[in-house]
């Protein structure tokens, strides 16, 4: 049983977690329709057990994640890569397979109050993650390897520093990128 409560967007996401036989309690936000009783349930879970935010890898999911992060700064974050959350012309956690969801939960990270400033835009540029025609795909791959999700260059840099990614993790992800 996962200690933290998993916060998902909708009923289909909850059903997917159950269908994958992941032993965890969930709370759904019903999209961005966060009613007071839902926020109170999330707050109670956050204070008692901790929460893992697992939203869809799309714009709406990122807005919900940001809103919840502002309210619950010590929440953990799990990211399923976009390419692993697409099926039947639909994008969402409910489309992801069990392995993708488990990997995202295993790699869940907490934002740090004192973000490190280990990485700069130069690191991204030197490794083809910014300013190249395939930078977006490269960031997507590295983000999936690191468990921090996809973002544009500026967002990606914030995640690298904010989620405490180490140089060793960075180097291993780049090595995997360059091998593939």
Model-predicted regions and their roles:
Residues 1:
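Catalytic phosphate/metal-binding cores of nucleic-acid and nucleotide-processing enzymes, i.e., regions
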Residues 29-32, 56-58, 80-85:
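Short, ordered loop/turn segments at secondary-structure junctions
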Residues 67-114:
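Long, charge-dense
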Residues 103, 110-180:
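C-terminal, charge/polar-rich interaction regions
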């Amino acid at each position: 049983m996962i200690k933290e409560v998993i916060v998902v967007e909708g009923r289909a996401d909850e059903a997917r977690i159950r269908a994958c036989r992941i032993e965890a309690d969930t709370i759904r936000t019903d999209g961005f329709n966060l009613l007071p009783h839902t926020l109170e349930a999330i707050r109670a879970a956050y204070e008692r057990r901790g929460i893992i935010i697992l939203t869809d890898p799309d714009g709406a999911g990122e807005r919900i994640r940001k809103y919840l992060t502002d309210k619950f700064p010590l929440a953990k974050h799990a990211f399923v890569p976009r390419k692993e959350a697409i099926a039947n012309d639909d994008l969402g956690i409910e489309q992801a397979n069990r392995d993708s969801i488990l990997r995202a939960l295993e790699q869940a990270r907490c934002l740090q109050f004192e973000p490190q400033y280990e990485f700069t835009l130069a690191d991204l540029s030197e490794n083809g993650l910014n300013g190249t025609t395939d930078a977006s795909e490269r960031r997507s791959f590295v983000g999936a390897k690191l468990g921090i999700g996809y973002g544009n260059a500026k967002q990606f840099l914030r995640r690298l520093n904010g989620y405490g990614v180490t140089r060793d993790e960075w180097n291993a992800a780049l090595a995997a990128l360059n091998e593939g």
